[in-house]
Regions:
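Alpha-helical transmembrane segments, especially those used as permease/efflux helices
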Residues: 21-29, 34-38, 162-167, 195-308, ...
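Basic-flanked hydrophobic alpha-helices used for secretion and membrane insertion
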Residues: 315-568
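Small-residue-rich transmembrane alpha-helices
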Residues: 31-45, 78-82, 89, 114-144, ...
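Short cytosolic juxtamembrane segments of multi-pass membrane proteins
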Residues: 2-6, 180-195, 583-584, 674-684
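Juxtamembrane interface at the cytosolic side of transmembrane helices
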Residues: 78, 86, 178, 224, ...
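Hydrophobic alpha-helical transmembrane segments of multi-pass inner-membrane transport and secretion
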Residues: 20-47, 56-92, 112-122, 126, ...
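A short amphipathic helical element positioned immediately N-terminal to and/or at the very start
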Residues: 4-18, 272-280
């Protein structure tokens, strides 16, 4: 019986005596369990399930649980590998005293069991306690009524327990792999065996610089938001690879350059720190690169999701400039004539009146649309030979009658034969002429007219809104030409948008129970669709606002949760980096003090090393963020939010707050490093 408990006691004693190493690891494990449980529970929360807009939030949170699971696996592997390296000397001593590797494996097994039990139990307990607080915060972000019913998600408990059991099993197997094949002498000398100083690797440094320059060029050169979405992940991968190459290889090259600068290198505060950094920069560079990438992820997430959440009402108003939007679709060879549109207008207004409301701020207009690939100022409609890469260049072309545009905007614009006005959305159009499929050419009189808000802003593809005179004549010519050339029949649409004095819960189908104008209009238009053979749709700002809030609120909440996880991960990496360097530099500083280096000189050397290395990730993360700004702005346009000033503000505030937190971590970890390197000298 005592033999069975021996390994458990040895495991617990080893963890307790190495608590400086294990405590951050245990806290990280518990924090991952906590975050996973909360996100998993919220994604299936009955509160979100029964609220308007909750479906969008649930989907976003499910994606967040996948991110947490993958990140937990990678991060916990990284930190546990560090723990095993630091304890190799201890395991070597066990081996010398008669324990075989099988016995050491049993100690590791018990450490894994203890770690899993402590962290999973603590994480789930805190998760159940804090879950309701997170749910209340989520509900408040979605701006819906609060409920105070306490719930425990059994499925989330089981999922978290199973996931982290699998992760800890893999970590155990990796730890056994690290010890396999290492002799007792090798384990005992593991901390004393040094690495060869890495040489400056100019090829890898140049490769990193080229990759980073390429990613930055993509960020600033892409104009269309859809193309930005397509290339965003490629640019992210390029930045990650470049960051690792520059920190691992470029930092070594930098250290070699500093060593060649005798005035800088041969100073007490620089000599030890620079030589130490160059000696182990390959390992430290990877850690610093990880911190830089995590910092960039936090800054991008917080700045973009905060901008989305703060500007969500602007996005709603851009997509739905009026309370209601009625659209009737018909083929262009059978367009609605004036008598039919007047009948529809009277029918809509009568439906609103019978429901107890009135229309105001009315905008009614016709439009016809085609799509094709731009070739300079020519939009080619026959895209049979188009490649998959051309999909991001497909442009929507909407033609509106001049008289309808004037009526909708209150302007008095005029056009002659062959002249048009153009408004470009999510693309640039710098040309003086517009040609449609090489046959219909128009002179562009103005490229910057205000576009009509509403359905046009819903397209994520590049869009050109073209105001044209003699609309009916042009539509007939276009229809005849395209039907003969491609066999196409175009779709003509009549829009009738208006505000109403009805309360929001009576405007749209928000809760599925309250009688509302949206359902009444759909009932009226169903008869029109059946009798006339046309398509119809009704959109309510009030009903769709909940979906916007659900999506933007969910993204903001997920951004906060993931940022917390990534910040703690960055802190843990920095902490372990300082511990590792502190233990490795301890004997070196002891020797330097014995040959005349004072504690003041030691402190200066530490500050020099920390200031030179510690702030590099923050500075480079700031540079990454600046070049990512055009990408972020274009991606937000896909969410109907085009507010550059707001994005600049949220980005600046996010970086300032993060920099303050980073400075605090610098102070704390710097003190830890100093205490370690000064331990031997103070004992004397």
């Amino acid at each position: 019986m005592r033999e069975k408990t021996l390994y458990a006691r040895l495991a617990w004693t080893g963890m307790r005596k190495n608590r400086r190493l294990y405590l951050p690891y245990l806290l990280s494990c518990a924090g991952m369990v906590l975050m996973f449980y909360i996100l998993m529970g919220l994604s299936g929360s009955p509160v979100l399930e029964h609220m308007s807009g909750g479906g969008s939030s649930a989907i976003i949170l499910r994606l967040g649980t996948v991110v947490i699971a993958v990140f937990a696996l990678i991060f916990l592997f990284y930190t546990h590998s560090f723990l095993i390296r630091r304890r190799e000397r201890e395991f070597g001593l066990y081996n010398v005293l008669g324990m075989g590797k099988g016995n050491i494996a049993r100690i590791l097994l018990w450490e894994t069991v203890i770690t899993y039990g402590l962290t999973t139990g603590t994480g789930l307990l805190l998760g159940m306690v804090l879950y309701k607080l997170a749910e209340l915060g989520m509900v408040r972000l979605l701006q819906v009524p609060v409920t105070y019913t306490l719930t425990v998600s059994v499925s989330s408990l089981l999922a978290a327990a199973a996931l982290f059991a699998a992760i800890h099993t893999l970590i155990l197997l990796n730890g056994l792999r690290q010890l396999h094949g290492v002799s007792a002498v090798g384990l005992l000398r593991s901390e004393s065996v040094g690495e060869k100083p890495p040489k400056a690797q100019w090829v890898l440094t140049a490769a990193g610089a080229v990759l980073l320059a390429g990613a930055y060029w993509l960020a600033v050169s892409i104009r269309e938001p859809l193309a930005a979405l397509t290339w965003f992940f490629a640019a992210v991968l390029m930045v990650i690879a470049a960051t690792y190459l520059l920190f691992i290889s470029g930092s070594v090259t930098l250290c070699r350059g500093l060593q060649r600068n005798k005035k800088y290198y041969y100073r007490p505060q620089h000599f030890v720190s620079v030589s130490s950094m160059a000696y182990r920069m390959k390992r430290n560079g990877a850690g610093l690169a990880s911190v830089c990438i995590l910092a960039t992820m936090v800054l991008v997430m917080i700045s973009s999701t905060t901008c989305l959440y703060v500007g969500q009402e602007d996005a709603v108003n851009s997509r739905y400039p009026r309370d209601m939007d009625v659209a009737v679709y018909g083929r262009s060879d059978h367009p609605l004539d004036e008598a039919e549109t007047e009948q529809l207008r009277q029918g809509v207004e009568s439906t609103v009146f019978n429901f107890g409301g009135q229309t105001s701020n009315v905008a009614t207009y016709r439009e016809i649309s085609v799509s094709g690939l731009p070739d300079g100022g020519d939009l080619r409609l026959g895209n049979a030979g188009a490649s998959a890469a051309d999909s991001t260049r497909v442009t929507q072309l909407h033609f509106l009658p001049l008289e309808d545009y004037n009526a909708a905007t209150g302007q008095s614009l005029t056009l002659g034969d062959g002249q048009v006005y153009v408004a470009a959305l999510r693309t640039d159009f710098p040309y003086d002429t517009l040609t449609v499929d090489g046959e219909w050419t128009f002179r562009v009189m103005d490229r910057d007219i205000p576009p009509l808000s509403g359905p046009f802003t819903a397209d994520i593809t590049p869009t050109l809104m073209v105001v044209i005179p003699h609309f009916t004549q042009f539509v007939q010519e276009l229809e005849d030409g395209l039907s003969e050339k491609y066999g196409w029949y175009l779709t003509a649409t009549w829009h009738y948008a208006f505000d109403t004095d009805l309360p929001e819960n009576q405007q749209g189908n928000i809760d599925g129970t309250t009688p509302n104008l949206e359902d009444a209009l759909n009932g009226y238009l169903a008869g029109v669709s059946s009798d006339w053979g046309v398509g119809v749709s009704v959109e309510s700002k009030a009903a769709n606002r909940a979906d916007f809030y659900g999506t933007y609120g969910g993204l903001f909440f997920l951004g906060i949760m993931l940022s917390i996880v990534f910040i703690f991960a960055a802190v843990a990496i920095l902490y372990y980096k300082q511990l590792s360097e502190g233990y490795e530099d301890q004997s070196r500083f002891d020797i330097m003090q014995k040959v005349g280096m004072t504690k003041v000189d030691i402190r200066r050397s530490i500050n020099s090393q920390l200031l030179t290395v510690f702030y590099l990730p923050l500075v480079l993360a700031g540079v990454h963020l600046c070049f990512a700004f055009p990408f972020i702005h274009k991606l937000l346009i896909l969410f109907n939010l085009d507010n550059r000033g707001l994005l600049i503000g949220t980005t600046a505030v996010s970086f300032a707050v993060f920099a303050v937190l980073y400075a605090i971590v610098y102070k704390l970890t710097g003190n830890t490093y100093y205490r370690i390197v000064a331990e031997d000298t103070e004992k004397e």
